UniProtKB/Swiss-Prot annotation:
SUPFAM superfamilies: FAD-dependent thiol oxidase. Residues 1-8 are intravirion. It comes from Variola virus (isolate Human/India/Ind3/1967) (VARV). InterPro entries: ERV/ALR_sulphydryl_oxid_sf, ERV/ALR_sulphydryl_oxidase, Sulphydryl_Oase_FAD-link_ERV1. Keywords: Disulfide bond, FAD, Flavoprotein, Host cytoplasm, Late protein, Membrane, Oxidoreductase, Redox-active center, Transmembrane, Transmembrane helix, Viral envelope protein, Virion. This is Probable FAD-linked sulfhydryl oxidase OPG072. It holds the Pfam family Pox_E10. GO terms for molecular function: thiol oxidase activity. The keyword Membrane applies. Induction: Expressed in the early phase of the viral replicative cycle. Disulfide bonds join C43-C46. GO terms for cellular component: host cell cytoplasm; membrane; viral envelope; virion membrane.
Length: 95
């Protein structure tokens, strides 16, 4: 399934989940939700790529919400189909 059809919605949900964790402080619930989202992406290649990136960066064992947040920003920027969609990290405030 082509990420052009569902990618923006998936990224929006990912960043909403991260923002909610910034408000309620429940990092473990946030990580579970993020892993569920990533492990159920409709594109098998996207699912594999994101899961490997999460494992390689020890996201599930981190208790630092901002580490997780900036990881997903970097992942988004690496996958952005057009540089104009990239998030300027210098303008992002920590959660």
């Amino acid at each position: 399934m082509n990420p052009k059809h569902w990618g923006r919605a998936a990224w929006t949900i990912i960043f909403i989940v991260l923002s909610q964790a910034g408000l309620d402080g429940n990092i473990e619930a946030c990580k579970r939700k993020l892993y569920t989202i990533v492990s159920t992406l409709p594109c098998p290649a996207c699912r594999r790529h994101a899961t490997i990136a999460i494992e390689d960066n020890n996201i599930m064992s981190s208790n630092d919400l901002n580490y997780i947040y900036y990881f997903f920003i970097r992942l988004f920027n690496n996958l952005a189909s057009d540089p104009k969609y990239a998030i300027d990290v210098s303008k992002v405030k920590p959660l």
